[in-house]
Structures are given as structure tokens and as C-alpha cells.
Amino acid sequence: MKKSTHLLIASILAGCITSCSSGKRIAQHRIVTNPMNLNYRFQPKDESRREAADPVLEYFKGYYYLFASKSGGYWRSEDLAGWEYIPCTTIPTLEDYAPTILPIGDTLYFTTSSGKTQIFKNAHPEKDTWEAVDTKLTYRLHDPAFYSDEDGKVYMYWGCSDKDPIMGVEVDPKDGFRALGEAKALI
């Protein structure tokens, strides 16, 4: 009985060893997890919390551009794995919350939540050479977002309240993002 048990165990082990050492290799895929080592800032007041909230990402001229609140700059990447940080001093509202960006043609546009709506543009965002747009949009935007429809129309929507609705209006980017009509409650 002992011999048959030993023989059975030896056979199982031999089978396992043979199958494990077969010439077949399992393809290994690189797994990327959180490849960005963002230079998050910390809020200096009250409890210490990390910043860089409200991320927004757009593909523009072969690169992904990422903006986040209170980050002192923005990032770009060709492959979403390797990121280059671009410090920014030419957008005075960069340190405000809730950025939004919009590529139109060869230009990238930027705005944030601020007391006065200011929009900036840059045809070469790999460089910190942003210029102010003569902004004609007069609504005070809280958590704004650009939206470009398939028909070429551009909209701005905004809102962050437990009482007020999310608002939206069609805008004309060729005329300082002037509102085309009245803002409407969307939600």
C-alpha cells in the first residue's frame, strides 16, 4: 500500500514538474498603475488636505494635457504613462479651482472658477506663453466646463450648488466667448 501511495505521489509530482517546465511562456503585460507623481500641494489652513482636485484632460497636437486645481502648472504626456510638468506663471487665475480646457483648431483655451470670468489661450501649451482673450462672457462661472458639440457649436456650462441649477449657454469663441442668447437652467 505504501508503494502505491508513493508511486501515485511521485507520478503527480512528475506531471506537475513536466507541465511547469514545458517550453511555453506566458506573455507578460506591463501593468501601469498611477504613473504620475504629481507635485500635489497641501492646503495651509485648517486640516491639511492635498490639492489638485477637479482634473481635466484633453488631447491636443499629439499630447494629452492635464490641468488640476491649485497645481502651479499643468502636465503633458504622449502616452498617458510618462508625464512632463509645465510650471505656469502666465495665467493669473491658474490657482483658482475647477479648471476647464478646450482645443479649437490650433489653440488651447483655459478658464477656471473665479470672481470674474477670464479666458486664456495658447497655440503652444508646451511653453508657458498663455495670453488673455478679450473675454465677453459676463456670467460669473462656478465650476465651469467648455463643451464643443459635433456640429461645431461651443457651449459653456457651470454650477455648483445645493440650490441653484447647472446653467448653460452657447458661446462664440471667435468673439471672446460672447454668449449667444440667455443662459438656461439645464439640471
Give the location of each predicted region.
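Bacterial Sec-dependent N-terminal signal peptides
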Residues: 1-24
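Carbohydrate-active catalytic/glycan-binding domains of CAZyme proteins
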Residues: 20-187
